[in-house]
Amino acid sequence: MKIAFLTAGGIAPCLSSSIGALIEQYATLKPEAELIGYLNGYRGLLLGKSIKFPESAKNNFSVLYEFGGSPIGNSRVKLTNVKDCVERGYVKEGEDPLKVAAEQLKKDNVDILHTIGGDDTNTMAAQLSNYLKENNYDLTVVGLPKTVDNDVYPLVQTLGAWTAAEQGAIFFENIVNENTTSTRQLIIHEVMGRNCGYLTAQTALEYNNSCL
């Protein structure tokens, strides 16, 4: 059995630990499984660039819980943006990125693909799975939803959101402490959130709780 991983979309403080948790489970449930990671998300899949996880990773997975980022890289490449994929040299003119990615998964004999990302990442993963099934290749896709916005319905909590709020509150606390050096400072702490107000609200709550 071959298991593949990729991380894609916007960064969030959960990519490394998510991979670590998956390795931990496979080391227990399927120790004989071969684990690979596509480098820099869907870009690596399109270009056929991957790395094989050494057997030692199955015993040393806990180190991934200590770091942010992604050990296999990340990108925002979208298989549905054909023009961008062609311009960047990920596929040739006239090629369908979805088909190129699917054929690479077949070539690599991948049985299970774990996609760690947001809506776009996991929607594309589902499209890949459907394409392969239509072409008589059975691939199981497991999507792990991560976003600091915590706006993936119907999930109550997405990966990365809590940590982002916690760190935002710590940052604000440090800045507020600096404000005691002057009586003529105005601090505006802007928190991202797109059309969702979760991160702003949760960051404020975390800061308020730290002051109690």
Map each language-model feature to its residues:
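Short glycine-rich or small-residue beta-strand-to-loop segments that form or flank ligand, phosphate
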Residues: 2-12, 71-73, 111-117, 143, ...
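Gly-rich Lys/Arg/Thr-decorated short loops/hinges at beta-loop-alpha junctions or inter-strand turns
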Residues: 3-5, 65-86, 146-156, 181-184
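Short glycine/serine/threonine-rich phosphate/pyrophosphate-binding segments
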Residues: 12-22, 45-46, 96-99, 119-127, ...
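Glycine-rich nucleotide/cofactor/substrate-binding loop typically near the N-terminus or early
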Residues: 32-108
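Accessory alpha-helical/coil subdomains and C-terminal extensions
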Residues: 35, 103-104, 108, 112-117, ...
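Active-site-proximal loop->helix
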Residues: 47-51, 151-160
